[in-house]
């Protein structure tokens, strides 16, 4: 469909016309036009503005209001889709909630990111299995649609700029409306999208952004959340600017230097051709300039793009690797008419990454075995709406066990996950959601590639997951088209797919690296037949286990944590890694999964509401298998022994005791008596069978003949106290940062009580707030948004987010009968990143009628939409009484008579006892104060004369037209009353 740029490009809108055009929505009630700041500005004049024309990318996460809509009933969906509401009938006429004066006091206040699904109660409905038993979908229309509303200002200084609103992701069908103007829709729950709202933004005034999100449909078979669960941005640029994701740095590393091939795409959204050049500067990790280049000037037609290609050589580059995360920055300046009109920054890394069929992945020429995990994007207490700090927390937990790579199963990740991986040294196998060559599928994949191509952590593109068509000739056509997109917009990374039941056949031949899911024996056969093709385990293991549980109990939904427990006969952790690590040609693989996740409960369904595949539970508490991987994926000494040693009623019965370790030998002691030492074989564990007796089990680990580590489990006493630990010593007071507060239940001697389920309540004071709770129990149906949670296997967690004011955050954990615990961290005042200010209506305070007032519908009489329009039901009366004088404004009271939200001043306002009178716009208001309300009569000076009933005319037939041929429709025209009763009530916003 044609866009504004297409019109400009076609020359249908001349520059002179643009310069002269003005947006003038006429207000019949106030008989006034919008201020001149709303005029479109000739962007030839803008270039001379210099610094005022700079790019701004402002976070639009704070200060939203939210309300559920309805997928089936327009009356519960603010009239959307109803026959009487013409949302699409007239431009700029989209539903009352778009009015600034609209009363949203019953809407919930919140900040983004937001996932409303995790706030819902669980439902035991088999159809909800993959949604984690949250009520979403066609059967649950009342909880499947949400409306978001945000009021914000755009400065008058932004006149002439290009204004866009960017969404990093919303689940799933999103409709965007600005100032009553329908902007557009987006389908898909994971890829970013944006809208150019330049023509619809009110410059120098307040704006109302309305977003409807419909989560009825599903993309996946796992929990996906609902709502605007990623960041939203307001972006302001010159009409001549770097295109979104319009820079790409491709590096070629040679001895002592790196040659950077730089692509810059510049867009001209103005109405006239522009001559522009690009200045590129490369900054090293310390911020020093190490290379510069200026392109020749090139003419860019109106509505067109221009690509600039430059070469910069960096001497003695610092290469990005897993151990040394050196990040460079490309600073791009667009220059026109002697002024810099746009400045765009691109972080990137210099490194090489290639696959060798015999050595696997080579990073900077060094073989790196992929010790990877697949991960979905939800977390305890949060659902799918993860603050940035939680991305870093999750990457850190994976790195603790030696994981060096993540597969973003099964969708494009949030950009902040890639930032975390760039900065912390983690590789990314970047996956799209839809394997398709239809326009939507290719667009999603192109967005993924363009957005993520400068991240050094991204080493390969994934074109899909377990697609049955991939192994067919038709799949080959689809994958070929997708591969062409990757080559066009990147070309520096290979492509692959996580296939189902096949390796490298049919359409899978399109893959540069042969991926396979679970088929270890077939992978070996494939390598023998195709020794020149790199091979990688795109999905492996699928072992299951419940943290802290060692006896499988189907009724309770728990699975033993001993490693052999898998689903569908797939490999154990130890079985897969021993196979993988013994084959240098096998590039490594990605374990299913790093973290437990909601939905797809495995191996059991209700009461389970989450999977148990994770090596780590939903909170981030490690399971026992974590220490197997840590033993063989890291160089640090590891010794971990399990199970716990609290087994009342099991005296004299045999219990398997396992130890995970990478030491030379481990000796086991039971109640002080040695059961012998065992040698540790590579990539394996050691085990003993022990007859249970209360007391202790102790493992002693030896390396090079020396005792270097011990690990001990003891039979504990009853739960006596709580211990509270924060994962960080301090946070930034930016309203975004998050700290995990882990609660451990201990006995009187300070030992973790592993079989307790005490209810723990969190209280937060100071410069923070509680945003979620969790415990890793896959069967727990308590709300993640409550203030308390039961301990599970001795642990639970509270997630605390900072406020925007510096100070201390104090968290207290209490439980009946146990000693409480508290912890304090500092929230350091910081400079906030650029963001859109939160708009709040001023509430005047004072005597008499001073305050905010809104109309209410009459309790008797024709209380319908027509009357609502007449009285201006969404109006706001800001009244200020000083003695007998009444001043203030009336906003949005034009009602049926047209107009917008520009406040009209109150003039000639008086208060005499209980009587009030004032004028505003074209209306006179008179009435009396009655307890908690003001009863007024509104007299309107109409710009037209109301029709009068037809007169009796001699000779006019009872049926048929008048003899003079006059129009009889005047007989049924609405007669607008000249005086309307208006009742006001006092409000807080």
Where are these regions (language model features)?
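N-terminal secretory signal peptides and thylakoid transit peptides that target proteins
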Residues: 1-15
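Accessory beta-strand-rich segments of carbohydrate-active enzymes
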Residues: 50, 119-123, 138-245, 270, ...
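N-terminal helix-cap/turn-to-beta initiation motif at the start of protein domains
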Residues: 52-60, 99, 839-856, 880-883
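Beta-strand-rich structural segments
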Residues: 262-265, 643, 657-661, 700, ...
């Amino acid at each position: 469909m044609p866009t504004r740029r297409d019109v400009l490009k076609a020359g249908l809108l001349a520059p002179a016309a643009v310069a002269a055009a003005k947006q003038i929505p006429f207000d019949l009630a106030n008989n006034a036009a919008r201020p001149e700041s709303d005029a479109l500005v000739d962007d030839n004049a803008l270039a001379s503005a210099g610094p005022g024309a700079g790019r701004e990318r402002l976070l639009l996460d704070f200060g939203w209001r939210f309300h559920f809509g309805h997928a089936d009933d327009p009356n519960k969906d603010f009239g959307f889709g109803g026959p009487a509401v013409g949302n699409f009938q007239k431009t700029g006429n989209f539903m009352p909630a778009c009015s600034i004066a609209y009363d949203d006091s019953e809407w919930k206040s919140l900040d983004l990111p937001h996932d409303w699904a995790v706030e819902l109660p669980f439902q035991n409905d088999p159809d909800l299995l993959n949604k984690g038993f949250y009520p979403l979908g066609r059967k649950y229309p009342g909880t499947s649609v949400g409306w978001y509303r945000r009021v914000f200002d755009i400065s008058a200084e932004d006149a002439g700029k290009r204004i866009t609103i960017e969404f990093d992701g919303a689940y799933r069908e999103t409709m965007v409306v600005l100032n009553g103007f329908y902007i557009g829709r987006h389908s898909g729950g994971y890829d970013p999208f944006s809208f150019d709202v330049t023509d619809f933004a009110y410059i120098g005034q307040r704006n109302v952004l309305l977003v409807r999100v419909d989560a009825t449909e599903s993309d996946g078979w796992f929990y996906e959340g609902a709502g605007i669960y990623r960041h939203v941005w307001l972006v302001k640029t010159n009409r001549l600017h770097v295109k979104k994701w319009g820079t790409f740095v491709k590096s070629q590393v040679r001895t002592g230097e790196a040659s950077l091939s730089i692509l810059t795409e510049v867009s001209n959204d103005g109405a006239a051709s522009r001559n522009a050049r690009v200045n590129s500067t490369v900054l090293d990790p310390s911020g020093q300039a190490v290379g510069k280049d200026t392109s020749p000037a090139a003419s860019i037609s109106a509505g067109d793009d221009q690509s600039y290609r430059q070469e910069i050589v960096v001497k003695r580059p610092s290469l990005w690797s897993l151990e040394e995360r050196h990040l460079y920055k490309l600073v791009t300046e667009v220059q026109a008419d002697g002024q810099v009109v746009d400045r765009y920054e691109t972080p990137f890394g210099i490194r090489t990454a290639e696959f060798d069929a015999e050595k696997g992945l080579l990073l900077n020429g060094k073989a790196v075995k992929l010790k990877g995990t697949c991960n979905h994007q939800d977390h305890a207490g949060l659902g799918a709406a993860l603050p940035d700090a939680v991305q870093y927390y999750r990457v850190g937990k994976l790195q603790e066990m030696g994981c060096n790579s993540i597969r973003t199963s099964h969708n494009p990740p949030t950009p902040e996950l890639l930032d975390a991986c760039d900065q912390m040294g983690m590789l990314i196998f970047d996956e799209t959601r839809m394997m398709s060559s239809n326009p939507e599928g290719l667009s999603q994949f192109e967005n993924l590639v363009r957005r993520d191509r400068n991240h050094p952590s991204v080493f390969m593109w994934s074109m899909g997951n377990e697609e049955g068509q991939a192994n067919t000739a038709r799949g080959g056509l689809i994958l070929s088209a997708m591969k062409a997109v990757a080559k066009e917009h990147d070309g520096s990374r290979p492509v692959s797919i996580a296939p189902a039941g096949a390796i490298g056949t049919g359409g899978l031949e399109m893959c540069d690296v042969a991926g396979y899911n679970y088929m270890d024996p077939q992978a070996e056969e494939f390598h023998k037949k195709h020794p020149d093709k790199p091979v990688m385990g795109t999905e492996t293991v699928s072992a299951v286990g419940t943290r802290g549980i060692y006896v499988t109990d189907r009724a309770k939904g728990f699975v033993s944590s001993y490693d052999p427990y898998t689903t569908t006969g797939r490999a154990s952790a130890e079985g897969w890694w021993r196979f993988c690590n013994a084959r240098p040609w096998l590039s490594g693989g990605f374990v299913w999964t790093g973290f437990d996740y909601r939905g797809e409960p495995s191996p059991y369904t209700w009461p389970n509401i989450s999977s148990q595949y994770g090596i780590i539970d939903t909170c981030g508490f490690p399971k026992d298998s974590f220490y197997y991987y840590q033993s063989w994926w890291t160089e640090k000494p590891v010794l971990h022994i399990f199970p716990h040693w609290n087994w009342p009623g099991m005296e004299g019965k045999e219990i398997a005791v396992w130890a995970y370790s990478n030491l030379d030998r481990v000796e086991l002691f039971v109640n002080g008596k040695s059961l012998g030492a065992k040698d540790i074989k590579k990539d394996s564990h050691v085990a003993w069978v022990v007859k249970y007796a209360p007391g202790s089990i102790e493992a002693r680990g030896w390396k090079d003949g020396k005792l270097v580590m011990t690990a001990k489990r003891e039979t504990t006493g009853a739960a006596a106290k709580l211990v509270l630990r924060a994962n960080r010593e301090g946070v930034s007071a930016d309203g975004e940062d998050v700290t995990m507060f882990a609660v451990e239940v201990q006995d009187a001697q300070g030992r973790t009580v592993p079989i307790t389920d005490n209810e723990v309540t969190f209280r937060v004071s100071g410069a923070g707030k509680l945003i979620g709770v969790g415990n890793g129990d896959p069967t727990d149906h308590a709300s993640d948004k409550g203030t308390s949670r039961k301990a599970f296997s001795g642990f639970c967690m509270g997630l605390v987010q900072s406020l925007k004011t510096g100070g201390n955050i104090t968290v207290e954990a209490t439980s009946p009968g146990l000693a409480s615990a508290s912890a304090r961290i500092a929230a350091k005042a910081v400079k906030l990143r650029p963001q859109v200010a939160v708009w709040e209506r001023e509430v005047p305070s004072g005597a008499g009628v001073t305050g905010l007032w809104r109309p209410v519908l009459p309790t008797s009489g024709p209380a319908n939409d027509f009357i609502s329009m007449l009285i201006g039901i969404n109006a706001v009366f800001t009244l200020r009484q000083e003695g007998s004088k009444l001043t203030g404004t009336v906003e949005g009271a034009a009602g049926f008579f047209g107009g917008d939200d520009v406040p009209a001043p109150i003039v000639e306002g008086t208060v005499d006892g209980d009587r009030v009178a004032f004028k505003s716009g074209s209306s006179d208001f008179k009435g009396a104060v009655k307890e908690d309300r003001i009863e007024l009569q509104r007299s309107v000076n109409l710009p037209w004369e109301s029709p009068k009933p037809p007169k009796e005319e001699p000779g006019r037939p009872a049926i048929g037209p008048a003899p003079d041929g006059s129009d009889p429709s005047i007989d049924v025209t609405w007669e607008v009353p000249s005086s309307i009763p208006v009742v006001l009530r006092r409000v807080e916003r």
